[in-house]
């Protein structure tokens, strides 16, 4: 029920938006106009139930917000709302029983790029930070403590993982600014094997490209240090 209440709220808000000189018109499909008017019109009067007039109500996508809205309705309004929710749920169940077509090649390509682009950033940052941190650890702490190159690389990987925890949100936000919205697929199409294969393939290709691009710090680290180590050992 909490899943359907936001849909009802958004539908009510659109249908109850007042014109320049006209009063808000109540929808013909429901008789509980007074309770929905208090919910749907932004800044409208909330004179029902125990909520004060200036107290903001929580969103209906939370259990507390849905409970407060239900308690603010009268018995006839609650029965009308329950009847409409049952009708909406029956329509949704009927649509789920229909056989869904597999995703088109265009949709699969969109799913591929939608999953590949963020993982390019993840792979790039992970590899670049690991190389830089591992090299600095080897040249500073490694000389003092005498740790091996593999131990320095492991510590660099630790730094890269810790940095990835904080940078993951920024990478996702940057990828969302590119205009890649969520693929328009039905729930059945999302669960199909074609979509899953395209999703995992996009992630794998994105990480591979990102890790290859993340090797660019090796350009700035010359081989003179390794040559000096070889000369000293010889």
From Swiss-Prot:
Phenotype upon loss of function: Knockdown leads to irregular staining patterns of perinexal proteins, altered calcium and potassium currents, impaired cardiac conduction, and intercalated disks structural defects in both cellular and histological levels. Hearts ultimately develop dilated cardiomyopathy, severe fibrosis and congestive heart failure.
UniProt entry tagged with the keyword Transit peptide: yes
Segments in the Extracellular topological domain: 132-138, 225-234
Localization terms from the record: Cell membrane; Mitochondrion inner membrane
Transit peptide, from-to: 1-55
Residue stretches spanning the membrane: 111-131, 139-159, 204-224
Keyword terms, alphabetized: Cell membrane, Membrane, Mitochondrion, Mitochondrion inner membrane, Transit peptide, Transmembrane, Transmembrane helix
Key word Transmembrane present: yes
A Pfam family this chain is assigned to: TMEM65
Functional note: Essential for maintaining proper cardiac intercalated disk (ICD) structure and function as well as cardiac conduction velocity in the heart. Its association with SCN1B is required for stabilizing the perinexus in the ICD and for localization of GJA1 and SCN5A to the ICD. May regulate the function of the gap junction protein GJA1 and may contribute to the stability and proper localization of GJA1 to cardiac intercalated disk thereby regulating gap junction communication. Regulates mitochondrial respiration and mitochondrial DNA copy number maintenance.
UniProt protein name: Transmembrane protein 65
């Amino acid at each position: 029920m909490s899943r359907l209440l936001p849909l009802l709220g958004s539908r009510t808000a659109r249908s109850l938006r007042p014109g320049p000189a006209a009063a808000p018109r109540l929808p013909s499909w429901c008789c509980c106009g007074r309770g929905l008017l208090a919910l749907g019109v932004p800044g409208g009067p909330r004179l029902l139930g125990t909520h004060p007039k200036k107290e903001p109500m929580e969103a209906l996508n939370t259990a507390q917000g849905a409970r407060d809205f239900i308690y603010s309705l009268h018995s006839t309004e609650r029965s009308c709302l329950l009847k409409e929710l049952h009708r909406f749920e029956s329509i949704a169940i009927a649509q789920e029983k229909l056989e869904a077509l597999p995703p088109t090649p265009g949709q699969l390509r969109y799913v591929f790029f939608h999953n590949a682009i963020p993982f390019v950033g993840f792979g790039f940052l992970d590899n670049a930070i690991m190389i830089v941190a591992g090299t600095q650890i080897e040249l500073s702490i490694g000389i003092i403590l005498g740790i091996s190159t593999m131990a320095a690389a492991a510590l660099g990987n630790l730094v890269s993982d810790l940095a990835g925890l904080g940078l993951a949100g920024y990478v996702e936000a940057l990828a969302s600014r590119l205009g890649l919205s969520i693929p328009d697929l039905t729930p059945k199409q999302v669960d199909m094997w074609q979509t899953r294969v395209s999703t995992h393939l996009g992630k794998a290709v994105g990480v591979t490209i990102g890790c290859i691009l993340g090797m660019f710090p090796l350009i700035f680290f010359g081989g003179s240090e390794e040559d000096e180590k070889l000369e000293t050992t010889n």
